[in-house]
């Protein structure tokens, strides 16, 4: 059966002072099934509707408040995706440019925005960001190499990071965008061991 694995993933969470959190996921996936023999012909594949285990599409679920969703690869926007708003999530049907056969790889970028008030809590000048460290990518997901980058507003002082499972925290860095003077603090987290759906849990990051 088709066996899709995320070989590398970078999840970037950018907190804006304008009431918005921008999330972008860079994903490299590989079909770990039996390797396709010979060359691929889309015509033959569609004509024969062969039983070869190819992944044509997969579903991912975003937060219910997700908006401004985009799906693209190195070539540009991929228009074959479909989006459906459910009661508790936004379902996105992602369809790569080509069906994925055994041994084939795919790279894509999925991005969206969520309102900050759903994830940021404050008491005076102290803030706590609470949101998913890893989110749903596809059913029965396995993520081999994972990086989370949290970009805070310029001038923030980074506090404690709490993870629901063991992770490695790299040294904090600064991210500069247009008109930034002092830079925006970046907290970088790496996984320790493969991640699965059991790791879809919230982190907490304090800052001032």
Stretches with model-predicted labels:
Residues 1-208:
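Lumenal/extracellular ectodomains and adaptor appendage modules
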